[in-house]
UniProtKB/Swiss-Prot annotation:
This is Fibroblast growth factor receptor 2. Its main location: membrane. Belongs to the protein kinase superfamily. Tyr protein kinase family. Fibroblast growth factor receptor subfamily. Its EC number is 2.7.10.1. Residues 160-177 are annotated as: Heparin-binding. It is a single-pass type I membrane protein. One of its GO terms (biological process) is organ growth. It is an enzyme of class 2 (transferase). The lineage of its organism: Eukaryota, Metazoa, Chordata, Craniata, Vertebrata.
Length: 824
């Protein structure tokens, strides 16, 4: 009896051992099916090999000398920058690497008439995983089994079966999944084009992941095209699903230009011609049209070619549009050689053609007769104009004779005309809203001019402004210089003002002068006067653009303000980005000044002081942004345009401005949706301005369309922490972006906190080159039409509105090197 019990125990143990070993045996069998990756057509003899573990960073450097253009590809597909992959010229950085980042990387350096390519092999491996199933986080769910009753096979995740057609480039990895369930657990087999799919049917074989119900084929080729059917079956039934695979062949070659194009052509002066250049390229081509002027030689006296770039792909220009070059109203200067230059990541190709210009003989013969015709036309036209002027003057004289009550008045008449100049940017003592105070500032009187008055702006009557002795400046001591730009109400020019500084009565001081344009309207004059009066009332402060004087008498209105030689803050920061961070082919350019972390904190502190002063004067800015902040020669930060009169009821926030920026990106939700402007809405804008500073002039909410931005702001999403920013400063930003205005800090609190941070910051904390900055492209606006909440998201949830903790700093931008020494 004892021997039989002992024998049965051994049988049960052996049976249990076999049942437990069977899954392990299947998995081991799967791993034996993994072939070595065959060499692809992109590989060379000795590529650089880089290995890393998941979650680590990978950096590739491609230094191939002076290159016009450097492009990066992965497995033959061109790469673009995103939140995990950063491309800066010859540098490629992959943050938080995953197994799907493994592959063959290539950098191509393009030069005139030649190109060079360097290759890298990146392996992201984990000892516990093959790397094929990094996105199969729900694999355990696929094996859910109902032990209570038997059941035929069924699909457990129909969403993974929705995409039936898969079109991929050659050399990519393809994975088909058929997650199923059943009791007993169904078996899986695969068919290709209706026949059993075996390892020997494909060079390199394939992988079957039974635990994830998947079929994996690496480095696909055109012969892999076809229908792939998964069959799930057990003793109670079977189900199947079919995928269709289409493999697009990629060809690594420089652009191919159609023979015979562009073609030589001849035309006469004044004619129109076009050159056509047909470009065929698998990779994205870059096309340029160049003109070598006809002067007997391609080389000028300075040793440089007479070369001019006429047209280049960029912005919203398509390849089809750039393939045609139009030369209209041809002159002799247009003669010469025209070259179509096309390049991609593999190399450069070009074709040239000649334009010959001949004199227009018919035009020369007709020139004499046309001159007589023009003279006759001018004479007749002049006579008719003289008759019209005479008739108008006679009617005017008769009308004046009838109105005897005006006959005794002098040549200059004064008509009382009150313009609605209101303090739209001030607030009352009991409210912080900018829409409550409507006190008129100044009374302007129009003046009808006699015939002797000549200095009259087109479209605007000449006005008599009341003289203010405190601010009036002699017009003869002001020397106007070059234009600085156009503002809201007119134009701004540089000038020299003698004696405007009371401490230096004999010295000339460089100032900026605001004046109306030639086509200014009465509203433009009203707005300029309103801004001048507002600046008078606000007074002076170190961190705002101060009013120095005005010329209001005996001539056009000149408003004299301080001059900031280094321009607006946004461009000031962008030109001082570390080498390699700006959008430029020359990544080794030395920035104008080496910025430190303390410089950025000091800039933020000065802005907070300026806004604290404006808030104390009950002034609401309503357009606080880096583009409206100026920098002086001594790097003093000054807030500008705080006195502008804006019609807040008629702004179309859905239209882009002329320079492509959307003002909604700096506006608080209550200002955006309810048109309520308060000091708290300025605090929100200050938080966005801080984000601009610590991204060195980055564009807020990059790639987010306006309609999506409205939705995301309402849902409580906010931008993530910039790379050159500590956790403490980012907390200050998010406090400024509180959904409830009363929960945001005041400018006084911001000044106190920034003063404390500034005193704890050393001068040696230079910006880290490895920290990613927002890409800056002056020609290419963001074109993404949707946002992602994955790695590409630029938002993080608002802790107040979403009841979530702050985003983990370890999963966002890389911190600065000095962050460990700062309070966080």
């Amino acid at each position: 009896m004892f021997s039989w019990s002992y024998l049965m125990g051994l049988v049960m143990v052996a049976t249990a051992t076999l049942s437990l070993a069977r899954p392990s045996y299947n998995i081991a069998e799967d791993t034996t099916l993994e072939p070595e990756e065959p060499p692809t057509k992109y590989q060379i003899s000795q590529p650089d090999v880089h290995s890393a573990l998941p979650g680590e960073s990978v950096e590739l450097r491609c230094l191939l000398g002076d290159a016009i253009m450097v492009t990066w590809t992965k497995d033959g597909a061109q790469l673009v920058s995103n939140n995990r992959t950063l491309l800066i010229g010859p540098y490629l950085q992959i943050r938080e690497a995953a197994p799907r980042d493994s592959g063959l990387y290539a950098c191509g350096a393009t030069r005139p008439l030649q190109s060079e390519t360097r290759y890298f092999i990146v392996n992201i491996t984990d000892g516990n995983s093959s790397g094929d199933d990094e996105d199969d986080n729900d694999g355990s769910e696929d094996f859910t089994n109902d032990n209570n009753h038997k059941r035929a096979p069924y699909w457990t995740n129909t969403e993974k079966l929705e995409k039936k057609l898969h079109a991929v480039p050659a050399a990519n990895t393809v994975k088909f999944r058929c997650p199923a369930g059943g009791n007993p657990l169904p078996s899986m087999r695969w068919l290709k084009n209706g026949k059993e799919f075996k390892q020997e049917h494909r060079i390199g074989g394939f992988k079957v992941r039974s635990q994830h119900w998947s079929l994996i084929m690496e480095s696909v080729v055109p012969s892999d095209k076809g229908n792939y059917t998964c069959i799930m079956e057990n003793e109670y039934g079977s189900i199947n699903h079919t995928y269709h695979l289409d493999v697009v062949e990629r060809s690594p070659h420089p652009p191919i230009l159609q023979a015979g194009l562009p073609a030589n052509t001849t035309t006469k002066v004044g004619g129109d011609r076009e050159f056509v250049c047909k470009v065929y390229s698998d990779a994205q081509p870059h096309i340029q049209w160049r003109h070598i002027e006809l002067n007997g030689s391609k080389i000028g006296p300075d040793g440089n070619p007479y070369l001019k770039v006429l047209k280049a792909a960029g912005g919203n220009t398509t390849v089809k549009e750039i393939e045609v070059l139009y030369v209209r109203n041809v002159s002799f200067e247009d003669a010469g050689e025209y070259t179509c230059l096309a390049g991609n990541s593999i190399g450069i190709s070009y074709h040239s053609a000649w334009l010959t210009v001949l004199p227009d003989e018919e035009r020369q013969l007709d020139s004499s007769s046309s001159e007589y015709t023009e003279i006759a036309i001018y004479c007749v036209g002049g006579f008719l104009i003289a008759c019209m002027i005479g008739t108008i003057m006679m009617c005017h004289m008769k009308g004046r004779g009838k109105k005897s009550d005006f006959s005794s008045q002098p040549a200059v008449h004064k008509l009382s005309k009150r313009l609605p100049l209101r303090r739209q940017v001030t607030v009352s003592a009991d409210s912080s809203s900018s829409m409550n105070s409507n006190t008129p500032l100044v009374r302007i009187t129009t003046r009808l001019l006699s015939n002797t008055d000549t200095h009259l702006l087109a479209g605007v009557s000449e006005y008599e402004l009341p003289e203010d002795p405190k601010w009036e400046y002699p017009r003869d001591k002001l020397t106007l210089g070059k234009p600085l730009g156009e503002g809201c109400f007119g134009q701004v020019v540089m000038a020299e003002a003698v004696g405007i500084d009371k401490d230096r009565p004999k010295d000339a001081v460089t100032v900026a002068v605001k004046m109306l344009k030639d086509d200014a309207t009465e509203k433009d004059l009203s707005d300029l006067v309103s801004e001048m009066e507002m600046m008078k009332m606000i007074g002076k402060h170190k961190n705002i653009i101060n009013l120095l004087g005005a010329c209001t008498q005996d001539g056009p209105l000149y408003v004299i303000v301080e001059y900031a030689s280094k321009g607006n803050l946004r461009e000031y920061l962008r030109t001082r980005r570390p080498p390699g961070m700006e959008y430029s082919f020359d990544i080794f350019r030395i920035p104008e000044e080496q910025m430190t972390f303390k410089d950025l904190v000091s800039c933020t502190y000065q802005l907070a002081r300026g806004m604290e002063y404006l808030a104390s004067q009950k002034c609401i800015h309503r357009d606080l942004a880096a583009r409206n902040v100026l920098v002086t020669e001594t790097n003093v930060i000054k807030i500008a345009d705080f006195g502008l009169a804006r019609d807040i009821n008629n702004i179309d926030y859905y239209k882009k401005t002329t320079n492509g920026r959307l003002p909604v990106k700096w506006m608080a939700p209550e200002a955006l949706f309810d048109r309520v402007y308060t000091l708290q809405s300025d605090v929100w804008s200050f938080g966005v301005l801080m984000w601009e500073i610590f991204t060195l002039g980055g564009s807020p909410y990059p790639g987010i369309p306006v309609e999506e931005l409205f939705k995301l702001l309402k849902e409580g999403h906010r931008m993530v922490k910039p790379g050159n920013c500590t956790n403490e400063l980012y907390t200050m930003m998010t406090d400024c972006w509180r959904a409830v205005p009363s929960q945001r800090p005041t400018f006084k609190q911001l000044v106190e906190d920034l003063d404390r941070i500034l005193t704890q910051t050393t001068n040696e904390e230079y910006l880290d080159l490895n920290n990613p900055l927002e890409p800056y492209s002056p020609s290419y606006p963001d074109t993404r039409s949707s946002c992602s909440f994955g790695d590409d998201s630029v938002f993080s949830p608002d802790p107040m509105s979403m009841n979530l903790a702050f985003p983990n700093p370890n999963t966002q931008m890389a911190p600065l090197k000095h962050e460990a020494t700062q309070p966080a």
